[in-house]
């Protein structure tokens, strides 16, 4: 029981959330989506008046796939992104590491992410008052391909809402 609690606590901290998000960004859209501090699929649906049916139809066209569920959508996104990465790098591997975690005020997080926060407030009624803590986590992603290596540094803004940490926004730090 104690081991389970330790594992759960170590996965629900800003560094872990940011690292898992950056890794999932390249490899697993379902996981990346689950790590946002808000309902990211609601943002996706906001352009379609909340209609999953219209969204899935549009995504079926965009990805040339039969998409009728979120799992179908995640698979199509992952497949498309993997194909793009393979075209650019050949066989590749993605690794991530956290290089810095800095506590910041909620006010600073909201200021730094102001454009995105306004969209969230407008489109999904995101309540910034529910944020109780904030950090900015710098993570490095490395794509090692057959012929080249690409490195990217990303500042991930992670906020605490209702006891859980989630991604508010990310900004390239290169």
Protein language model features and the residues they cover:
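Short, low-complexity N-terminal intrinsically disordered segments enriched in polar/charged residues
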Residues: 1-27, 39-58
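Amphipathic alpha-helical recognition patches that constitute DNA-binding helices
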Residues: 13, 33, 153
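Hydrophobic aliphatic residue packing
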Residues: 14-18, 137, 167
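Short, exposed beta-strand/loop patches in secreted or surface proteins that constitute
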Residues: 25, 128, 158
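Solenoid-repeat scaffolds in large eukaryotic assemblies
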Residues: 29-36
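Surface-exposed, charged secondary-structure patches
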Residues: 51-148
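Short beta-strand edge/turn micro-motifs at domain boundaries
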Residues: 147-174
